[in-house]
Amino acid sequence: MQTATYTPGHSAPVLSLMAQRTAETHAEFFLPQLIPGWSVLDAGCGPGTITLGLARRVVPGLVTGIDVEDSQFAKSREQAESEGLNVEFRKASVYQLPFQDHCFDAVFCHALLEHLSDPAAAFTEFRRVLKSKGLIGLRAGDMGGILVDSESEGPAQGLATYLANREKDSRDPYVGRKLGRLLRKAGFDLQRITASYEVITETLLKIGPSLAAQFAAPSYCSLQDKASDHSLFVALAWCEAIGRAE
């Protein structure tokens, strides 16, 4: 069964943190590839803050952001209107994109594949809507490379619980390292693949209680407990890939 579930949920703290992501901080590897006038799809756009950055890059081109949770779009819609950006937000699933074949010059996808039960099916749709020689830019986390240090065992236990829930729901927490393989299998020519780290300590401190409530897992709460003594360090591995439709 093809499903897309955002494991951290959509609580106010989670949405607030997602909204802090920008194209400059989380799509930097792909921005130089974009050309003014292009039509771009931002798949799994969340609150749309990255979408806005992509739109600024391709003015006067159209950037379309899609997500299964459309309650996130309001602020970015207002911002796009105030800046005069050519942006459209739509509720849609990457498994069934509501677009004609070969209509986008580029597809961007950030932090989505690790939340899909069938990433390969999404790649098939990405390939369908891309024009010939169109570009795809992907960024996905890889939990196999996560770094954790704390004076307490609680944070590591909390992250282990999070990882177990992802795997139980048929999500691949190690999809980042597989981006090149997935691109090739979907018929793309792999142009570039890189990896990077992001320190996410503050992020986890803020969303720990939300995760605890969602999964009824008290070990998540220990993340919040470490806020005062600064003993916690967590860094997440990201993998980035660029492909071209053949």
What is each stretch, according to the model?
Residues 20-36, 53, 57:
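Conserved alpha-helix/loop element of class I SAM-dependent methyltransferases that forms part
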Residues 2-22:
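Class I SAM-dependent methyltransferase Rossmann-like catalytic core
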Residues 41-43, 47-96:
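Class I SAM-dependent methyltransferase SAM/SAH-binding core
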Residues 135-202, 215:
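Conserved catalytic/acceptor-binding region of the Class I
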Residues 120-135:
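A short glycine-rich, Lys/Arg-flanked "PGG" loop and its adjoining helix->strand segment in the class I
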Residues 173, 177, 192-246:
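Conserved Class I S-adenosyl-L-methionine
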Residues 105-118:
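A short SAM/SAH-binding and catalytic strip from SAM-dependent methyltransferases
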Residues 95-106:
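A short acidic, Gly/Pro-enriched loop at the edge of an enzyme's catalytic core
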